[in-house]
């Protein structure tokens, strides 16, 4: 039996700012639906991925910023670095290790506890 991860909720306080950030790093906005004043659903998918993230308002009881880790995989770290830099994404470091990048949040502040949006 195959099990595939489809969608992961990422709680945020500022949906528009978070959406702009994810689009800036290359995610595609598949859906952006305001169901009501209290509920908005935004689904974003990284290029080539079968799994998406969901940001929005009224989607989860998780505290905004409480998801403190997300990993993505790329075939070529140098190409990914150049692509992000070309998109104007500021990186806090070129590499933490041979296979990782450290994107800087939109505010320029690093935060392990809470996302700036």
Model feature map: region roles:
Residues 2-3, 9-51, 86:
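Core segments of cupin and vicinal oxygen chelate
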Residues 2-7, 65-69:
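Short, solvent-exposed beta-strand edge segments and adjacent coil->beta transition regions
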